C-alpha cells in the first residue's frame, strides 16, 4: 500500500525548498539533518514551524525537505512557504488562516544589484567638498 504524501515548493530570495509532508509524529528533516542540527538560531526554527502551528497540525506530519541555494534566512523562508503550500493539499480549509498569516505569499524582495560608479547598490563613494 502506498503511503500518502503531500508536496509543496517554496521560494525565498535565491532559495528553493521542495517539501514533502507524510503522516507521522512531527519529525522535520532538512537535507538529511534534523531541524535542530540544520538551523542553529531559534528564530529560524520558529519560522519553519509557523505554518504547522498556525493550522494546529504540529506533531501530525513528518516533514522532509530538500532545500537549495541562498543563506539560512532565505532557506527558512522557503521552507515555510513550501510547508504552507503542502498543507493546502492536505486540507483546503487551511487556506484562510495561512493566507491571513501571509505564508502563501511569495516574498518577492530580492537583493538589489550593484550599480557601476557606486560602491554597492546605493552606497556612493565618499564625497569630499575640497
Curated annotation (Swiss-Prot):
InterPro entries hit by this protein: Ribosomal_Su5_D2-typ_SF, Ribosomal_uS9, Ribosomal_uS9_bac/plastid, Ribosomal_uS9_CS, Ribsml_uS5_D2-typ_fold_subgr
Origin superkingdom: Bacteria
Alphabetical GO biological process terms: translation
Pfam families (alphabetical): Ribosomal_S9 (PF00380)
Family matches, as PROSITE patterns: RIBOSOMAL_S9
GO terms of molecular function: RNA binding; structural constituent of ribosome
Protein keywords: Ribonucleoprotein, Ribosomal protein
UniProt keyword Ribonucleoprotein, yes or no: yes
A GO cellular component annotation in the UniProt record: cytosolic small ribosomal subunit
Family indicated by similarity: Belongs to the universal ribosomal protein uS9 family.
NCBIfam families reported in the protein's UniProt record: PRK00132.1 (NF001099)
Protein name: Small ribosomal subunit protein uS9
Organism expressing this protein natively: Halalkalibacterium halodurans (strain ATCC BAA-125 / DSM 18197 / FERM 7344 / JCM 9153 / C-125)
This protein's encoding gene: rpsI
